Amino acid sequence: MKNFKKVLAVLLAVVMVLSLAACTGKKDDGGDKGAAKKTLVASIEQGLEGKFSPFFSLSQSDTNVAGFVTLYTFPVDRVGNPVLKGMGKDGETRSYNGKDYTYYAAANVEVKQNDDGTVYYDMTMRDDIVYSDGTKATIDDVIFGLYVYLDPTYDGNATMYSLPIEGLEEYRAGMAPLYQLLYVAGEDNTDFSLWTEDQQKAFWTEGLPKAGEAFAQSIIDYVMINYAAAYGLETEADAIELWGFSGENAAEMWASIYDAYKGDIDGEEGINETEAADRTVWACLDPAYTVGIKTGESAANITGIQKTGDYSLRIVTTKFDATMIYQLSLPIAPMAYYGDASLYNYENNQFGFTKGDLSIVKSKTTTPLGAGPFVFKSYENGTVHLEANPKYLLGEPKIANLDLRETSEANKVSGVVAGTIDIADPSYDTDRAKEIAAQNGFSADEWEKFDGPKLTTKLIDYLGYGYMGINPNLVKVGNDPYSDASKNLRKGINTIISVYRDEYIDSYYGNTASVINYPISNTSWAAPQTTDDGYQIAYSKDVNGNPIYTAEMTVEQKHEAAVKAALGFFEAAGCTVADGKVTAAPAGVELKYQVEIGAGGTGDHPLYLLMQKAGEVLGSIGITFTVNDWANANDLYATYQNGTAQFWCAAWGAATDPDMYQLYHSNGSTNYYHISDKELDDLIMKGRASADQPYRKAIYKSAMEIILDYGVELPMYQRSECTVLSTERVNIDTLPGDMTPYWGWAAEIHTLEMK
């Protein structure tokens, strides 16, 4: 289901790649030249498939394994900002949370925007990188990897082929994978000049149905791993229903999906774009269908990939793309291992494999090799065994062995206590916090104690945020949902709800969540900070633009001030206000509203009691505001996707780049607020078109202020996730400081120590 996938969870795998694959934190010059004779056991999500290649890993768990073995060109910092100047011995120092941190990278990247609209990305890598097998890395390895990702038959998870790289379209032209040609031609095709009739029949009767079933199974597995505990899922049918389809098993789910999309797999709103959890349908096909078929002429190389030295290259794009820089965090993978060195000759347009045939690369998928902090040794019985790489660029890890063990959600905390694992990342809420407190010998009232004799808990901001949305087409005055009167109506309601956020979010989360005031996750570098000029608490000014609250006000006084300010907004919206109440509504306005919330039908949601309180207060001044608690999350999603919800409570996922197009642009695919504002659209496009981060941050703040002025979204909370470690076995002092979703416990794995 589109919203469930994209809004709540799809970014998790990407984040893990960025934080684990670029394990480049504090520089360690050795000290203890021999790795400590210790083994660290870390939990990993169930779903290992043994596909550990940096090119073809599919599941989140497999991708994480690849990240420990592979060295990437550069990491992102604690706010997800690429580290582009960290190659030198002194690294690159950046401030976070009032502290300076130094980041190291395998390569530097310089970005230059040209007057003609083209962009140069000049990359220079270190000349002392050595793979764990002793061979030396050069820029040819990076070029090899680029051509793997950009091959016409590439069917992994990377999407570099969608970027505006000069000459890419010409290179990929004239060849297509067999499955693509068969799919486009259709089941009734009669032209068998490029394939046989038997091949076509086999594709439609066996190949595609089997791939579809595997695709559906990947969704089921993804849902059960990530959401079984939160949603009380017990069977595959439960997972299928949560994703929004019918069926008792994967085959039936695929039939339901295929029917719902009328067979549209590759369209902009097709199955691959909308439903994929961690892989596309095509990634599930038999390899026989991925072979490249020549259909015409094509370029021999990609003109925008230019080798400029043994350790440098330039990538040229035809225009600026804000996501391009993140895609350049590339694996430095040995071409001689993953490809064929005899097939590499840059000057003669040979790039380590035969164009259209990636079989040699895929043959190494189960046994990765790289220059990362650890060396792959084995995978069996749900455990990946890795050993310290003495040739690692930042120094040999102090932990000799790292075991990554599949662990169910229910066994993560108990596993750390029992000693079967040392580090885990369980889902986090007050019940889990109380479980951890009990294991540490604390009382239930001491659940906010994070450090104990058995377990240490490190909280990390969740890559996303909770919010309340408003449909302006249903909460308006007259026929214009964007008139000042309509805005004031929505602002009045938001003012009432906003003042209670601190109290009710704290009562649900304690100090494991914080109130936010802009529609963006605090994890983003673009998020306004309280110290920034012009920072404001959401809906804290009255209809005349004056502050509603003062620092001296008590909580009760703030509540009273909010009601007074809200009445001012309602009056400006055309309501009749007398004796502290709305006594009459503008013509055509009923002043009866409902908020949709997915609290399981039991009220278990961080915003449920807040919405109930809002209904009570609004009711006391003449406005009906009721809460509708959905037992099934899919039903909630449907209400705001189909435009029937007036108000709803949900959560957005956050991407590494803060691009606002999808959610707020007039043409955004998930613009559920139906905003169509030229000024806002222009700001969003300006933000997309610049590499200047301070400029983009200012642009996005202006855009967010427009959104808040429309009164269509009330930012609510930034919640936390957690990492739980054994206090008895792990040296907690060697963890990275100020961990974030982008810089987790493994970001400086080479300096982590056991006791």
What are these regions (language model features)?
Residues 42, 134, 416, 421-426, ...:
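Periplasmic binding protein-like
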Residues 155, 202-217, 221-250, 254, ...:
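Extracytoplasmic/peripheral linker and loop segments enriched in polar/acidic and small residues
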Residues 377, 385-387, 484-616, 753-754:
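Append "and occasionally in soluble cytosolic enzymes with long acidic Gly/Pro-rich linkers
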Residues 43-116:
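N-terminal lobe/hinge region of extracytoplasmic solute-binding protein
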Residues 364, 382, 389-439:
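Ligand-site clamp/hinge motif
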Residues 78, 256, 262-312, 317-323, ...:
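Gly/Pro-rich hinge or "lid" segments in bacterial periplasmic/extracellular proteins
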Residues 107-278, 415, 482-485, 489-492:
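Aromatic- and charge-enriched surface segment that lines or borders ligand/interaction sites
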Residues 48, 60-67, 317, 321-322, ...:
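Detector for C-terminal structural segments
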